């Protein structure tokens, strides 16, 4: 919630929570769905870009992301999905979402021109994707850090255009995805 996020970012001016939950930098009395909240998110994002903290990739890429906790590593493929797939039920929902929350996230994306919060999707196992992920993970990660909670986070950018095209082709053949 917003109060927990306010506590979390104290002493962390570069926290991306300031983009995804920008109300934490505003008076707590302001309504969460007020346009000023979205504008603050955009302002915070543009400051991170201007200061060189984050940058938009020059091309569309897929990424491999790994989390290691208690000796167990889980891997994921990171990319973008079409909102049309959500509305057309290619992406299956496991619960009813609140209309106000959907509109909130849509407004946030529209105003900031970014999607700051990941949505975890799962799909039936595809060996070809697993093989690509295995190969990518044999290389040195682009990012490798252990967070204060002890969880190790690693990520690899897949810059090879042919591999990205292959992943896109494979995923296009997946009949449906599920919100995890």
What are these regions (language model features)?
Residues 1-178:
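A cross-family signal for N-terminal binding/gating loops and helix N-caps
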């Amino acid at each position: 919630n917003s109060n927990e996020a306010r506590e979390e970012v104290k002493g962390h001016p570069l926290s991306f929570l300031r983009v995804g939950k920008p109300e934490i930098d505003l008076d707590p009395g302001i309504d969460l769905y007020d346009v000023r909240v979205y504008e603050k998110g955009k302002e915070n994002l543009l400051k991170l870009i201007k200061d060189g903290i984050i940058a938009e990739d020059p091309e569309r890429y897929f990424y491999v992301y790994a989390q290691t906790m208690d000796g167990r590593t889980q891997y994921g493929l990171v990319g973008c999905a079409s909102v049309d797939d959500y509305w057309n039920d290619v992406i299956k929902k496991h619960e009813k979402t609140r209309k106000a929350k959907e509109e909130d996230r849509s407004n946030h994306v529209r105003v900031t021109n970014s999607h700051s919060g990941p949505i975890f999707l799962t799909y039936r196992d595809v060996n070809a994707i697993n093989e690509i992920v295995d190969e990518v993970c044999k290389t040195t990660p682009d990012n490798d850090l252990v967070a204060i909670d002890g969880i190790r986070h690693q990520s690899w950018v897949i810059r090879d255009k042919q591999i990205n095209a292959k992943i896109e082709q494979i995923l296009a053949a997946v009949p449906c995805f599920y919100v995890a």
